[in-house]
């Protein structure tokens, strides 16, 4: 891990890039009980047009915000509820250029982090639910 110190503000940031390109940043805060995790992706409200198989593909306005909510669905239920039951305070937001998922907690951080990484890495979409919501 690369370490960068910011002495003016008394912070150190550890950074590592995984083989898949995912960048991880850790800001150690040993004096704090509460821990915080944030996962961001470069996909936001302005991302409505793509090239798929060489052809332009338009998606509906609001699709990023819709997907932000759908990402919490898992085959076993809703990740928001699981995180909350596990003592975390989860949330998410969509801006023009990104979508972020995060939580904070004082206990069970590693388990909550696994849950977060699982639902953002393995989306659970069903044809019926997706089609119904997109038509609304």
Task: Tell me what each language-model feature is.
Residues 123-131:
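Short secondary-structure capping/junction motifs at helix and strand boundaries
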Residues 132-136:
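Conserved small/polar residues in nucleotide/adenosyl-binding loops
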Residues 27, 32-50, 62, 78-122:
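M16 family metallopeptidases and their MPP-like homologs
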């Amino acid at each position: 891990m690369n370490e960068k110190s910011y002495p003016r503000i008394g912070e150190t940031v550890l950074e590592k890039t995984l083989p898949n390109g995912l960048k991880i940043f850790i800001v150690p805060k040993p004096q704090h009980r509460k821990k915080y995790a944030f996962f961001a992706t470069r996909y936001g409200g302005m991302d409505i047009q793509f090239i798929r198989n060489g052809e332009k593909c338009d998606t509906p306005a609001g699709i990023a915000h819709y997907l932000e909510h759908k990402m919490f669905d898992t085959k076993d239920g809703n990740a928001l509820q699981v995180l909350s039951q596990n003592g975390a305070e989860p949330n998410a937001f969509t801006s023009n250029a990104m979508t972020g998922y995060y939580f904070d907690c004082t206990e069970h951080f590693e388990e909550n982090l696994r849950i977060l990484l699982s639902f953002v890495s393995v989306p659970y979409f069903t044809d019926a639910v997706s089609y119904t919501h997109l038509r609304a």
